[in-house]
Structures are given as C-alpha cells and as structure tokens.
Amino acid sequence: KAYGRQRIHPLVAPFLAAHPQVDVQLVVTDRVVDLFAEDVDLAIRITDTPPTGLAGRPLEAVEHIVCASPAYLARRGTPQHPSELTEHDCIYLGEDPSDRRWRFTQRGQAESVTVAVRGRYVVNHSEMRREGAIAGLGIASLPGFAAQGALERGELVRVLQAWRHDTAYSGTAWLLYPPNRFLPSRLRAWVDYLASAIPQG
C-alpha cells in the first residue's frame, strides 16, 4: 500500500488534468490481485519475478534502507555492522514474526547477516515508521522512497550503507496488464505516463 500512496497517488491529479477524457479508480492493497478474475486493467506489483501470462514494464527498483534521526544516533551511536542493531531500538513492520529478523548482504561481498531486532515501537505503516524515526524512537526499516524526503532535509541519516537490506518487500515495481497487443488508448496513456513519471534508476 505504501507504494501506491506515496508514489502513484501523487501522480493521479496531474495525469487527470492532462487527460480530461480518462477516469482513474485506484485500489490500494497489499494482496495479489487477479487481473482477469477481478476485471482490473492494470496492477503495480513489487517483485523480482513478474508473473508469466501478463505483459509488464518495470518502473523502478524499490530498495529498503535503515535510517535514524541525527539526535538518536548522537545519543545511542551509529551501528557499523548489522550485528550492532541488537544494541539499538529498531522500528519495524510487525505484520509477521519474520519482520523483526532483518537480513543484510554486504555490497560486493558474499557475507550475509540476519539480526533479530527489537524496539519499543512497531507499526505496519511506512510513513508512521518514518515519523517515529524522525522523533528519535529508533532505527527504522523503510522503503527508500518513503525516506527520501526526510534524508534530503537532514531529518534522517542512512546507516549501514555498505550493506543491502534484504526484505520481502524489496524488488522491482512492475506495471502489469493483460497481454493484449492493442491496449485501449486510455490505458496506454496511463501506462506511458507512469513509465515516464517514474523513470528507471
């Protein structure tokens, strides 16, 4: 849901302004939608293995990062290795027991580490985790797109940058639609708009 709220929703108003003959119904959900059974024109799914039987275009990589406020790091110190997270308050998703087991792979190396984190604030909403981190409640696991603005403003600092934070919610954001050679012009306009507004990077 976070991707739809924070990356897709802000693009709806400018798209509708540019395409007055097109309407958009946006359904934000974390479940896998069956486009055929549910008569859905287009889905956006974060995955490294897009389903066969659907056409698709990659939008962008969705990476998760760990970050904290400057005040928290000044008070508690900055972890240099994932194993040091056990000495910190961590803010995590908490929808599944595996959400508190943070996995890391060292960039350019084979080393992989899984750390069982704990913290006083657990919340299943990325914007709330971000705000909790800004308030100094701990080190948060966040999608990069959710943290970007706060990082640019200096409200958050990224930690453990030498490590990739591997989560079940990381991957490539894919636009998926029925494999019809001739997409309706209104759907094609939305697909092209999203692909240009969210360039691969």
Q: Where do the protein language model's features map onto the residues?
A:
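Beta->alpha turn/N-cap motifs
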Residues: 30, 46-49, 68-70, 142-145, ...
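Flexible hinge/capping segments at coil-to-helix
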Residues: 53-93
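Central regulatory/effector-binding core of bacterial HTH transcription factors
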Residues: 1-55
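Short, well-ordered beta-strand core segments
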Residues: 41-43, 65, 90, 140
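A late-sequence structural motif
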Residues: 161-201
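Secondary-structure junction motif
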Residues: 89-109
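Hydrophobic hinge/microswitch elements
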Residues: 114-166, 177
